[in-house]
Amino acid sequence: MRYIALLRGINISGKNKISMPELKIALGEKGFGDVKTYLNSGNVLFSDDEPDAVKLAERIRTIILEIFHLEIPVFVIPQDELKFLLSKAPSWWGSDSKDIYDNLIFAIAPNSIETVAEKIGEPSAELEKVQIYGNAAFWSFDRKLYAKANWWKKTAAPGIGEMITIRTANTLRKIAEM
């Protein structure tokens, strides 16, 4: 089965540095098939026979700890499931508007998106929109006023940030088709 692993918080402002070519080699050497990476932000595609995405995430997390000596949360989703999820996007999400920034928030096991949403609270009216589907949340916000948006302020906050990983609509569309 084809999977996508999303690594949380790597290669940001010189922190949690992981070389994508080195990670690709390491995962291949540890038995993952047809490993590919996209961008430097921790997007990894691979094949494996394991049906449990949470077990795969734990295997990848352990490999990263062993090779790179970093404790990195990992979210894994079957590629077909990501495609299905993207097909369920609300009409306001993923537009071509340069004024709006569209993201998808994934809850990293054992967390649920409902718990994350409860901790963050209601989105700021007029500034952002949120719609939960499965264990993810479609989230869009006004690029000019993002700093005033409730979800923007809280997604990186202690107690919430480590529960999630976030990707843009464009990144997810690309890796869904790779």
Across the structure, where does each feature detected by a protein language model lie?
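Surface-exposed, charge/polar-rich loops and edge strands
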Residues: 1-41, 45-178
